[in-house]
Curated annotation (Swiss-Prot):
<feature type="transmembrane region" description="Helical; Name=I">
    <location>
        <begin position="12"/>
        <end position="40"/>
    </location>
</feature>
<keyword id="KW-1278">Translocase</keyword>
<feature type="transmembrane region" description="Helical; Name=X">
    <location>
        <begin position="371"/>
        <end position="400"/>
    </location>
</feature>
<comment type="function">
    <text>Component of the cytochrome c oxidase, the last enzyme in the mitochondrial electron transport chain which drives oxidative phosphorylation. The respiratory chain contains 3 multisubunit complexes succinate dehydrogenase (complex II, CII), ubiquinol-cytochrome c oxidoreductase (cytochrome b-c1 complex, complex III, CIII) and cytochrome c oxidase (complex IV, CIV), that cooperate to transfer electrons derived from NADH and succinate to molecular oxygen, creating an electrochemical gradient over the inner membrane that drives transmembrane transport and the ATP synthase.</text>
</comment>
<keyword id="KW-0999">Mitochondrion inner membrane</keyword>
<feature type="topological domain" description="Mitochondrial intermembrane">
    <location>
        <begin position="41"/>
        <end position="50"/>
    </location>
</feature>
<dbReference type="GO" id="GO:0045277">
    <property type="term" value="C:respiratory chain complex IV"/>
</dbReference>
<dbReference type="Pfam" id="PF00115">
    <property type="entry name" value="COX1"/>
</dbReference>
<feature type="binding site">
    <location>
        <position position="40"/>
    </location>
    <ligand>
        <name>Na(+)</name>
    </ligand>
</feature>
<dbReference type="GO" id="GO:0015990">
    <property type="term" value="P:electron transport coupled proton transport"/>
</dbReference>
<feature type="topological domain" description="Mitochondrial matrix">
    <location>
        <begin position="479"/>
        <end position="515"/>
    </location>
</feature>
<feature type="binding site">
    <location>
        <position position="290"/>
    </location>
    <ligand>
        <name>Cu cation</name>
    </ligand>
</feature>
<keyword id="KW-0496">Mitochondrion</keyword>
<feature type="binding site">
    <location>
        <position position="291"/>
    </location>
    <ligand>
        <name>Cu cation</name>
    </ligand>
</feature>
<keyword id="KW-0460">Magnesium</keyword>
<feature type="transmembrane region" description="Helical; Name=XII">
    <location>
        <begin position="447"/>
        <end position="478"/>
    </location>
</feature>
<keyword id="KW-1133">Transmembrane helix</keyword>
Amino acid sequence: MFANRWLYSTNHKDIGTLYLLFGAWAGMVGTAFSILIRAELGQPGSLLGDDQIYNVIVTAHAFVMIFFMVMPIMIGGFGNWLIPLMIGAPDMAFPRMNNMSFWLLPPSFLLLLASSMVEAGAGTGWTVYPPLAGNLAHAGASVDLTIFSLHLAGVSSILSAINFITTIINMKPPAMSQYHMPLFVWSILITAVLLLLSLPVLAAGITMLLTDRNLNTTFFDPAGGGDPILYQHLFWFFGHPEVYILILPGFGMVSHIVTYYSGKKEPFGYMGMVWAMMSIGFLGFIVWAHHMFTVGMDVDTRAYFTSATMIIAIPTGVKVFSWLATLHGGNIKWSPAMMWALGFIFLFTIGGLTGIVLANSSLDIVLHDTYYVVAHFHYVLSMGAVFAIMGGFIHWFPLFSGYTLNYTWAKIQFLVMFIGVNLTFFPQHFLGLSGMPRRYSDYPDAYTAWNTASSMGSFISLVAVILMVFMIWEAFASKREVSVMELTTTNVEWLNGCPPPHHTFEEPAYVKSNS
């Protein structure tokens, strides 16, 4: 029965599909918010209203894209679908908890949307810093609803993380060691550990904010001996690992795509890739204060956070050059998924370079809260995480659905999206360098030209999103079935056919060890 299958599902493939659909829908909402932002900024002067409504839209855009698009698709969608198949497990370790992890997200989304419907909305930015998020600057229920939304999304992610860690460690065949796992499995394992360690700190921080707002505590209020800087430390101790949570599964997917379409049986430097991801995961926890260079830290503290942040470039560089080495000498197949992966490598590297610039505390003091920062993190998210999702989706779509996409349309869509995102975010570097601040709905006329270019780019990206929807419709309408898959011996998720049966591995998978 339909309701039983989809509401009470304990099947990793069905839950993965639910995550993908939910993430796609949230992605539409988040895209709509971003179009509103760029429409407002396309010309000087006011379009939608004051800065409060503008910042409510910015905040909603961030939360929707992070917690309801990237994480559900990468970890929930691809993770649920692929991890059990890749390690030969019959399902996830805790199938019913898996179901709950998903069904906590729609109520969480509902609370977030409710927060913008009551009072003036939560116009705090996704960081929700007090005192702006306190009960004077944001009277009413908006910020409280946002906090509850974050709590639900956080519980969902923590349960999901426990589930993935248990599944990956405990449900491999006896012959498969840690170092025989595909890189995507590694990336999800490391991501899950990061979630498990960072989310409780966020929960503590926003719970203290909640009591400051409603129960008259003064954790973040200097009048009662509190300190708003404490909130920033708690938030960014979560917030920085979070950005690595958003990109690590993308690293895993790109490794698979680049290896597959280079005709290689394994990625270059497997162990280097694994250790690079583990290093990134570890270092991600000890650099959080580089988001706070402007709050007045000691010079030696700033020196530490500058150098620690720069060290992350080393394992990241290991990954980039290993991808290039995987490509080297390969029989390269220019499929759309490969194009997304190559676009990922190039644009993520550019985003990484601007990150190195911002790691310098002296430079960051000038660039902090300008559009240079916006350009930086959108290069690594809008062209890193999103490109990885697009490449992964196109690569594994035949596995999920049993049908193939039209490759010509897929290549056109890639080209449109590539032009759109670059036209949107490249000019923002110039705006930032000339001092245009973030989180304002209006700006001096001097900034008009680059803002107009940026807004044009966002509308091109919108066309690409619509093209994507059309491509998926076209694939299901045409029903071109998958004829044959290549390289299945080193891509075990394809071994059970396209799509795989509802229950795979009803008896334990036999894995022969080559080492």
